[in-house]
Structure formats: structure tokens, C-alpha cells
Amino acid sequence: MARAVVHVMLRAEILDPQGQAIAGALGRLGHTGISDVRQGKRFELEIDDTVDDSELAMIAESLLANTVIEDWTITRESQ
């Protein structure tokens, strides 16, 4: 078994109000040096060797990400 990790993030040109709220809270809590925060999602899929990159891409585009406003990346982790 292996693990595929799909990271989904808002596109750079899309406003991220959650990220802005986190950045503001960090400043109020006394944390300095952080100029921006972007919030995203991480999906971990336990897969066997028959699942190839094109199938993972299809899953990411059709189910996990809203491709109008989000970008995604896939990495594989061995266990």
C-alpha cells in the first residue's frame, strides 16, 4: 500500500478570508514576521499500485477540488 496526498489551495488571485483572519489573529497573539497566510485542504488516499497518476488527477479534478477557484497538487508517500 502507498499513500497519495492531494493538496488543494485557493488560486493566488482568489481572496482567502480564512487565511486573512488567521494572519490577523497571529499578529494579535504577538507572533511577528508572518506577512500572509493561505488556508487549504489535505486529502490522504490509501492506494494500491494499480492507481496511476492520471487516475489521481481525475479524482482531484472531479471531486476534491473546485477547479474554478482552486489548484491542486499530488504527491506520493511510501509507508
Swiss-Prot record:
InterPro entries: PurS, PurS-like_sf. Keywords: ATP-binding, Cytoplasm, Ligase, Nucleotide-binding, Purine biosynthesis. Signal peptide: none annotated. It comes from the Bacteria. Pfam families: PurS. Pathway: Purine metabolism; IMP biosynthesis via de novo pathway; 5-amino-1-(5-phospho-D-ribosyl)imidazole from N(2)-formyl-N(1)-(5-phospho-D-ribosyl)glycinamide: step 1/2. It catalyses: N(2)-formyl-N(1)-(5-phospho-beta-D-ribosyl)glycinamide + L-glutamine + ATP + H2O = 2-formamido-N(1)-(5-O-phospho-beta-D-ribosyl)acetamidine + L-glutamate + ADP + phosphate + H(+). Its EC number is 6.3.5.3. GO terms for molecular function: ATP binding; phosphoribosylformylglycinamidine synthase activity. SUPFAM superfamilies: PurS-like. It is found in: Cytoplasm. One of its GO terms (cellular component) is cytoplasm. One of its GO terms (biological process) is 'de novo' IMP biosynthetic process. Homodimer. Part of the FGAM synthase complex composed of 1 PurL, 1 PurQ and 2 PurS subunits. PANTHER family: PHOSPHORIBOSYLFORMYLGLYCINAMIDINE SYNTHASE SUBUNIT PURS. Part of the phosphoribosylformylglycinamidine synthase complex involved in the purines biosynthetic pathway. Catalyzes the ATP-dependent conversion of formylglycinamide ribonucleotide (FGAR) and glutamine to yield formylglycinamidine ribonucleotide (FGAM) and glutamate. The FGAM synthase complex is composed of three subunits. PurQ produces an ammonia molecule by converting glutamine to glutamate. PurL transfers the ammonia molecule to FGAR to form FGAM in an ATP-dependent manner. NCBIfam families: phosphoribosylformylglycinamidine synthase subunit PurS, PRK05974.1. Belongs to the PurS family. This is Phosphoribosylformylglycinamidine synthase subunit PurS.
